[in-house]
Amino acid sequence: RVPELVFLNLDEAFGRTEGDEEIQDLLQGSRGLNLGLHFLSGALTFDPAVTKVGAELASRIVWLDAFLTNVDRTFRNTNMLMWHKELWLIDHGASLYFHYSWVNWQKHAVSPFVQVKDHVLLPEASGLEEADAEMKRLLTEEKIREIVALIPDDWLHWSESPGRPQEIREIYIRFLCERLAHSETFIKEAQDARKALI
């Protein structure tokens, strides 16, 4: 599960009274349209020593993070919450890290994603091949195109931009479709890393 996604506008006054300069810089850089997650009041940080996750769910989450190249769901920082006895995924900001350097995005699309070895749920993820089959059934090129089309143009204008918004969207689509078509590469990497753990 992922908390409800919402679009929100932050005006210039937001965060002016924040004492931490680094956070204030982040808030000032976030003026305008943002993507946020519904606040899960009373949620607790997921602790793998306290809460066990079944193999099917763990495998799906590991698959998703390997697909999106999310480097930030580790034992040190799980980026998961327990809320009403359910597991919720938060903070996907470290995903798709190829977009910090557009050079060789094609190479990144077919990479094995070696960072999966640090995934907090990897020890429980014994059903990766089944998760792969299920996710490929659900996540088609058409669905990827629908999702990427939702990205506002304003979010696709930056100084290091490789092109106009539609060109950038097309790179994201091609990246995700290539990743999906070559999922056996990151599945094998995850399986090998899991064998080394157990």
Report each predicted region and the residues it spans.
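Phosphate/dinucleotide-binding and metal-coordinating scaffold of catalytic cores
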Residues: 1-198
